Regions:
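Conserved beta/loop motifs at nucleotide-recognition and modification sites
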Residues: 1-256
């Protein structure tokens, strides 16, 4: 248990350092991005691109490489491509598992990571592929530890999400109180990509400045966990009609 807490604290410290470095324009050469919160990951990738590459120069200096079929040769050629009318290049590799690469490719990749040019920023994004370091592969793990940062974009704490939901609604000209923001999280889950689309729908639907629970219930699509809780609660209160209605909603959600 203590080890898990220490790992979580270390990951949070790296995340805070990454945000501070980014705000100060101090962007390194190598990053591993992983974690469930894709909204934040994509947000910070956009921030990195904006800070590293002048507007209009993205097509020359921003390189997006799919992990499937990627070779060390292809990556090396992209890394060696000099920036054009930009101080740096940004390379984003999606879903390439460094630690599961064939030995020859892994050795070549390790060499690339160990000697990245100063103008290059290389980001490995683990989206559908889970990130798991393997200390037995000492050279690769050592290169990542020495040259890069492993940044985890974890699910946000409820207090941070409530504040963020409030800011998003204010940007749409609405207000929402803490209890209703918490209800929205309960109903729609705590991942920001899911919440942002529901916030947009609710903001467009709400007639008054203050968003109400009725506004949320009218248009928000609940996650299955919330409906299961609602059904068991209705069963506990012996409200069978409501329980069966909720069961019907669950079947519909599963079909969708």
């Amino acid at each position: 248990m203590a080890t898990k807490r220490n790992d979580k604290s270390a990951a949070q410290a790296v995340y805070r350092k990454f945000k501070k470095d980014l705000s100060q324009g101090t962007i390194g050469s190598l990053y591993i991005f992983h974690g469930e919160e894709a909204y934040l990951r994509d947000y910070y990738l956009d921030q990195m691109k904006a800070k590293l590459i002048p507007g209009g120069m993205e097509s020359f200096n921003y390189h997006l490489l799919p992990g499937k079929g990627l070779t060390a040769q292809r990556l090396g050629e992209t890394v060696d491509a000099l920036p054009m009318m930009s101080p740096r290049t940004l390379i984003v590799v999606n879903d390439y598992d460094l630690f599961k690469a064939p030995e020859g490719e892994r050795t070549a990749m390790t060499k690339i990571l160990s000697d990245l040019p100063e103008y290059c920023c290389l980001v490995f994004v683990y989206d559908t592929v889970p990130y798991k370091s393997d200390a037995r592969m000492r050279k690769l793990a050592g290169a990542i530890q020495e040259k890069g940062q492993v940044v985890q974009f974890a699910r946000q704490q409820q207090g941070d999400l409530v504040d963020w939901i409030g800011r998003r609604f204010r940007a749409l000209g609405h207000e929402i109180d803490t209890a209703d923001a918490q209800y929205l999280i309960f109903l729609c889950g705590d991942l920001m990509n899911g919440l942002i689309s529901e916030i947009g729908k609710i903001g467009a639907f709400a007639k008054n400045r203050r968003v109400t629970r009725q506004d949320i219930d009218a248009v928000a699509i609940p996650v299955i966990d919330a409906k299961v809780f609602e059904m068991t609660d209705a069963l506990g209160r012996r409200q069978m009609d409501q329980a069966f209605a909720t069961l019907g909603d669950l079947f519909q959600l599963r079909q969708e």
